[in-house]
Amino acid sequence: MACAAARSPAEQDRFICIYPAYLNNKKTIAEGRRIPISKAVENPTATEIQDVCSAVGLNVFLEKNKMYSREWNRDVQYRGRVRVQLKQEDGSLCLVQFPSRKSVMLYAAEMIPKLKTRTQKTGGGDQSLQQGEGSKKGKGKKKK
């Protein structure tokens, strides 16, 4: 245990991990959501979390091929993990407004809906409607 205490908080493997499932309002707490559903975001991606965190000035890097262990869907859309540096070499906070991992997650969930990629995706939802009704043909009752 003394070995872990001697390691610097500025090393990349000491950065906190944020998976998209932590912020996803489609997930239950058992499935991995870590913030209240009222503050969660619909299907966030790791790149969106990275964009938001790096824009505020946090030291961030993206690991694209990492998967959250509770994520059953192995699709590329659900892959990725973001590592964020919370503490500097001397143990002090990088940014005072982010004292904990939960504060970073809440901030990311608040800012992701304001991204340009999210605000421009509002059009084109009517394509799923079917144009015509098919005539009902089926087998009749068997005649005796």
Curated annotation (Swiss-Prot):
<protein>
    <recommendedName>
        <fullName>Signal recognition particle 19 kDa protein</fullName>
    </recommendedName>
</protein>
<keyword id="KW-0733">Signal recognition particle</keyword>
<comment type="function">
    <text>Component of the signal recognition particle (SRP) complex, a ribonucleoprotein complex that mediates the cotranslational targeting of secretory and membrane proteins to the endoplasmic reticulum (ER). Binds directly to 7SL RNA. Mediates binding of SRP54 to the SRP complex.</text>
</comment>
<dbReference type="GO" id="GO:0005730">
    <property type="term" value="C:nucleolus"/>
</dbReference>
<dbReference type="GO" id="GO:0008312">
    <property type="term" value="F:7S RNA binding"/>
</dbReference>
<dbReference type="InterPro" id="IPR002778">
    <property type="entry name" value="Signal_recog_particle_SRP19"/>
</dbReference>
<dbReference type="InterPro" id="IPR036521">
    <property type="entry name" value="SRP19-like_sf"/>
</dbReference>
<keyword id="KW-0539">Nucleus</keyword>
<comment type="similarity">
    <text>Belongs to the SRP19 family.</text>
</comment>
<dbReference type="Pfam" id="PF01922">
    <property type="entry name" value="SRP19"/>
</dbReference>
<keyword id="KW-0963">Cytoplasm</keyword>
<comment type="subunit">
    <text>Component of a signal recognition particle complex that consists of a 7SL RNA molecule of 300 nucleotides and six protein subunits: SRP72, SRP68, SRP54, SRP19, SRP14 and SRP9. Interacts with IPO5, IPO7, IPO8, KPNB1 and TNPO1. Interactions with IPO8 and TNPO1 may be involved in SRP19 import into the nucleus.</text>
</comment>
<keyword id="KW-0687">Ribonucleoprotein</keyword>
<dbReference type="GO" id="GO:0005786">
    <property type="term" value="C:signal recognition particle, endoplasmic reticulum targeting"/>
</dbReference>
<dbReference type="GO" id="GO:0006617">
    <property type="term" value="P:SRP-dependent cotranslational protein targeting to membrane, signal sequence recognition"/>
</dbReference>
<keyword id="KW-0694">RNA-binding</keyword>
<feature type="region of interest" description="Disordered">
    <location>
        <begin position="117"/>
        <end position="144"/>
    </location>
</feature>
<dbReference type="GO" id="GO:0005654">
    <property type="term" value="C:nucleoplasm"/>
</dbReference>
